[in-house]
Design a protein with these regions (language model features):
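Short helix-initiation/N-cap motifs at beta->coil->alpha
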Residues: 75-77, 140-154, 301-312
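Alpha-helical, coiled-coil/dimerization segments enriched in small aliphatic residues
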Residues: 276-306
């Protein structure tokens, strides 16, 4: 077992949260270098609802010692030891920020990643529908410099002084950020440990030297590990029960696969559409997988551009019954104006989804417990309004639209109670 002392020359300045255990062989991140693609394609067949949309109800126990410290194990970081529950946490992606809020530790968040307003809008869209659940993101720090949102500033990690960093160290060693092993190790030793598993988002391969120790997790397995860091396993189980009940309700009322509409999930700009393969593996599609939908792009011979995009004519040939705009919920007026432009195109009547007005904003796959509940409900109503009630529209674009209580697919009050610790 490689202790964290092998990775630093002196003691960490943080005495109550420390790194320990086995991490990718010897040393903190021995050889965790190189690239790994998690790009999606559009060639997969439709996924049956009998496959991996049903997640195993696994526990992620922490291991406690006689002095009250505890450890949590997860690939690729190995066993991470904590002397106390983290009071300061960096949540780079919405999945960990939403988890921190859901598990009652939203106040511990010190910083977030990339554009703060886009990040804030991503989670506020759902939290606005819950009484008493808030995410005060405006004053949070960020580790991406304003001049380059696709980079990371190591000095900002020191300034934020977080007890734990919910980021995958293998991602930092990839070409996306290109940190050295020493740079990754110094943050863990001097500030706080890394705790993340980025490549489970699409079950992609991590950088080559990380692969022997890497493991992919479902969304709710991953969330269970985050809950264990905060020692909030009971809150996790309460949320997990809500999610399982919601998925069971959805699956019980789905039509046969042959009667389900064909679906396209896209990003689009100016009449150019970039498709996503939502039938692939990974927690990025945890809000779509339970529906067992056919990917409209998998069955088309329409030609793509050199960048894999489709033009409007190709959308006519693909003829999806429903089109979802990935991450459209965070775009506000931008999505509304884009939707009007798409639906007013002279070719709109030749695309079933556009002709019928079934072009909707969808959510973000980097989702935590609360986001996952809302995004499952939203998707159910967008795909099967006759079975789950109609999607009421985008509304003001700032908040999840009001849905009559009788048409809600999960209990909002139950969510707020769990966040408040009343369960």
């Amino acid at each position: 077992m490689a202790d964290n002392d092998d990775c630093r020359s002196g003691p960490t300045r943080r005495d109550y949260v420390k790194f320990g255990g086995t991490v990718l062989g010897g040393g903190l991140l021995a050889g965790c270098a190189g690239g790994g693609s998690d790009a999606t394609t559009t060639t997969s067949d439709a996924v049956s609802t009998t496959e991996t949309d049903t997640e195993e109800a696994t526990e992620t126990p922490d291991t406690e010692t006689s002095d009250g410290s505890y450890s949590v194990s997860m690939a690729p970081v190995g066993e991470v030891e904590f002397d106390a529950v983290p009071e300061r946490a960096l949540t780079y992606y919405p999945v960990s920020a939403d988890a921190a809020v859901a598990f009652g530790h939203g106040d511990a968040i010190t910083g977030i990643g990339y554009d703060k307003e886009l990040f804030g809008n991503t989670v506020d869209y759902y939290y606005d529908a819950l009484d008493g659940v808030e995410f005060e993101w405006e004053e949070l720090g960020r580790v991406t410099p304003a001049s380059n949102p696709n980079a990371l500033d190591r000095e900002l990690f020191y300034e934020l002084d977080s007890d734990v960093h919910f980021l995958d160290p293998c991602l930092l060693r990839s070409p996306s950020f290109d940190w050295t092993e020493d740079e990754v190790a110094s943050i863990a030793a001097d500030v706080g440990p890394w705790f993340g598993n980025y490549y489970s988002r699409t079950n992609a391969d991590p950088p080559e030297p990380c692969r022997d120790r890497y493991e992919h997790y479902t969304l709710w397995e991953y969330l269970g590990h985050i809950a264990a860091v905060f020692r909030e396993e009971e809150r996790y189980r309460a949320f997990r029960s809500l999610r399982d009940d919601l998925v069971a309700r959805i699956r019980a009322d789905l039509p046969p696969a042959s009667e389900r509409p064909s679906l396209a999930v896209v990003a689009d700009t100016g009449g150019t559409f970039w498709p996503y393969d939502f039938t692939g593996d990974g927690y990025l599609w945890a809000h779509l997988r339970p529906f067992g939908m056919q990917n409209a792009f998998a069955a088309t011979d329409a030609q793509t551009g050199s960048d894999g995009s489709y033009d409007y004519e190709a959308m006519v040939e693909t003829a999806p019954d429903v089109v979802l705009r990935y991450w459209g919920t965070a775009l506000g007026d931008s999505f509304r104006s884009n939707r009007e432009e798409v639906l007013s195109n002279p070719l709109a009547d030749e695309v079933p989804a556009f002709r019928d007005g079934r072009y909707y904003p969808s959510g973000n796959g980097m989702q935590g417990p609360i986001m996952n509940l809302f995004q499952l409900e939203m998707t159910a109503k967008q795909l099967f309004p006759e079975r789950f009630g109609a999607w009421p529209g985008y509304g003001d674009g700032e908040s999840y639209p009001e849905i009559p209580e009788a048409e809600r697919l999960f209990d909002r009050e139950r969510v707020t109670d769990i966040v408040a610790g009343e369960f």
